[in-house]
Amino acid sequence: MSKSLNIIWQYLRAFVLIYACLYAGIFIASLLPITIPGSIIGMLILFVLLALQILPAKWVNPGCYVLIRYMALLFVPIGVGVMQYFDLLRAQFGPVVVSCAISTLVVFLVVSWSSHIVHGERKVLGQKGSKK
């Protein structure tokens, strides 16, 4: 009985912490003058708490494991909702594809540029002029 209560406590604690960060993000988003999704702010709060080791990762790990395990199932309602607007998407197929391609290219460029800034130039082992 004690082991099952411990497992229930771990899952309950994980989901309470994840949802606390989510609702804190929603609350902060409602106070901001610009529109930022509360879920994004909540994720950033959770990230900061984990990165600064204020919140031990083992406390949220069981809940994260469950959410990641069933992530595909969570996208089913979104897919059904998109299919309701299939005619509209078909009419706007060109602009949607172009915007997706451009945004993907912009993301690639920003990530490569920021990676270059953060990591600098590092010599590859075996490259001419590098030390072994």
Curated annotation (Swiss-Prot):
Q: Which InterPro entries match?
A: LrgA/CidA, Uncharacterised_UPF0299
**Membrane spanning segments where?**
7-27, 31-51, 63-83, 93-113
Q: Where in the cell is it found?
A: Cell inner membrane
Topology relative to the lipid bilayer, per the entry, is: Multi-pass membrane protein
Provide an example Pfam family for this protein: LrgA
Source species, domain of life: Bacteria
Give the similarity note.
Belongs to the UPF0299 family.
Record's HAMAP family?
Answer: UPF0299
From the Swiss-Prot or TrEMBL record, give the protein name. UPF0299 membrane protein CKO_00648
Which organism's genome codes for this protein?
A: Citrobacter koseri (strain ATCC BAA-895 / CDC 4225-83 / SGSC4696)
Taxonomy of the source species:
Bacteria, Pseudomonadati, Pseudomonadota, Gammaproteobacteria, Enterobacterales
